[in-house]
Regions:
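Short Pro-Gly-centered beta-turn/loop motif in secreted/extracellular proteins
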Residues: 49-58
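Short, ordered, surface-exposed loop/turn motifs in non-cytosolic proteins
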Residues: 16-34, 140-144
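Structured interaction patches on ligand/partner-binding surfaces of diverse proteins
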Residues: 65-96
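Bacterial Sec-dependent N-terminal signal peptides
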Residues: 1-18, 95-97
Length: 417
């Protein structure tokens, strides 16, 4: 006998207040309890129709769209859809979409773990850097551009913002930036498909002393403000090749002689204060707070609105994985990448294989058989991004606002390639 089937209509519901609305062609998936999947796409009203046998289903949808210079990612899941012989097909299953917004500029690489010293006496960690990349097709010009990190510095430390297992700011539309922020006193412009290197510690050639380290004397930008952060281990005088106009300036509202980005498990983010200058924003005590540590400046943070945040990455230490907790909210980063520090390893973004292979002119320029992954972590695309870039290819990196999916541990800092 031919088994009976039923019409299931799924309606995608866009967030209230979003500048986006329903469009035709968004992929929607129905997954049965046995693992069987059914695929359909939406019509212009955001509806997708399925014909399925009786069963229990989960509907899911994911959409990525660009608008007004920003990238939008929308995700939604509806579980427990029970289709039985009483199902008439008149009911519409609504899947509420959550929206996250990211800018054109992404964090391509975050190197914080340090390396082993040549004499075997331990590790060296004052060579941190970040590479920002314009993942879009248009030049990006960012005003009032800033760098931030979340307290506590290590993911396995006590997080005072957790209440009954939930971040106290989970639904408050901000991320707390600890200690202080770094900001560029002028606009940051990155051409499409290009990158900038920012030395977060020591804009010098570290390899002259530690051969396993990196050369940051040729960085494009650096963090250097000796009045606020005076510890010379972190901030030696930058290389003369870096113009002083490319120094990031600090605004410190916490305490300390250095902006101590964790060498094990940082939560790092980039943002723009838009029409407010960084100094005015960071000095506004209405944004300041100390989670359960009132009056203690060591714990003072400032609340960065989530819609100001362009990109972020959360890192967990491999050695402290079981004790680590999220500090970034799901709308900013729904996952984490894992790092074994002190080995010269780096957190490197995965390639969007489909998008990269679809770029006109990339044929014959992409280098495959990627072999820089380590400790069971690698780029699933199989594309060697650095080798491909040197070969003239245009790389599109994966950006789903989930570091578990978007990053891997690379066994060598890309600046050493």
């Amino acid at each position: 006998d031919v088994y009976k089937t039923y019409l299931v209509t799924v309606q995608l519901a866009y967030p209230s207040g979003s500048e986006l609305s329903a469009v035709e062609g968004v992929p929607v998936k129905l997954t049965g309890s046995t693992g069987t999947t059914y695929d359909a796409t939406t019509d212009a009203n955001g509806k997708a129709a399925f014909t399925v046998p009786a069963g229990i289903y989960e509907a899911s949808a994911s959409e990525k769209r660009a608008s007004n210079g920003y990238s939008f990612i929308l995700n939604g899941v509806k579980s427990g859809i029970t289709v039985t012989e009483t199902w008439t097909g008149d009911s519409v299953v609504e899947v509420a979409l959550t929206e996250s917004k990211s800018g054109q500029v992404i964090i391509k690489e975050l190197y914080v773990g340090g390396c082993q010293k040549d004499d075997g006496s331990g590790n060296y960690q004052y060579d941190k850097y970040v590479i920002l990349y314009n993942n879009s097709e248009q030049a990006a010009t960012l005003e009032n551009f800033c760098l931030g990190m979340v307290n506590p510095y290590n993911a396995n430390s006590t997080i005072n913002d957790y209440k009954d297992g939930v971040l106290s700011y989970a639904n408050d539309n901000y991320i707390p930036a600890g200690c202080g922020i770094w900001y560029l006193p002028r606009n940051l412009t990155i051409e499409a498909g290009k990158q900038v290197v920012i030395a977060l510690n020591g804009a010098i050639n570290h390899t002259l002393t530690y051969s396993n380290s990196v050369n940051l004397s040729t960085a494009d930008y650096c963090t250097y403000d000796i009045e606020d952060f005076s510890q010379t281990n972190y901030y030696p005088t930058p290389s003369e090749s870096i113009p002083t106009a490319n120094y990031f300036t600090a605004y410190k509202y916490g305490q300390g002689t250095a902006w101590v980005l964790s060498n094990q498990s940082p939560a790092f983010f980039i943002f723009s204060t838009h029409d407010v200058t960084p100094e005015v924003f960071a000095s506004n005590t209405d944004y300041h707070y100390t989670a359960d540590k009132e009056g203690n400046a060591v714990y003072r943070c400032t609340k960065v609105p989530t819609d100001w945040i362009l990109d972020a990455v959360e890192v967990f230490s491999q050695a402290q994985l079981a004790k680590s907790q999220k500090r970034l909210t799901p709308a900013i980063d729904a996952g984490y990448t894992v790092l074994t520090n002190a080995q010269g390893y780096t957190s490197y973004r995965n390639v969007d294989k489909q998008a990269t292979e679809a770029v006109e002119g990339n044929s014959g320029k992409l280098v495959y058989s990627y072999n820089y992954g380590t400790d069971g972590s690698t780029d699933p695309s199989g594309i060697d991004a650095e080798a491909s870039l040197k070969n003239g290819a245009r790389i599109i990196y994966q950006d789903t606002n989930n570091s578990t999916n978007d990053f891997h541990q690379r066994k060598q800092a890309s600046l050493r390639d």
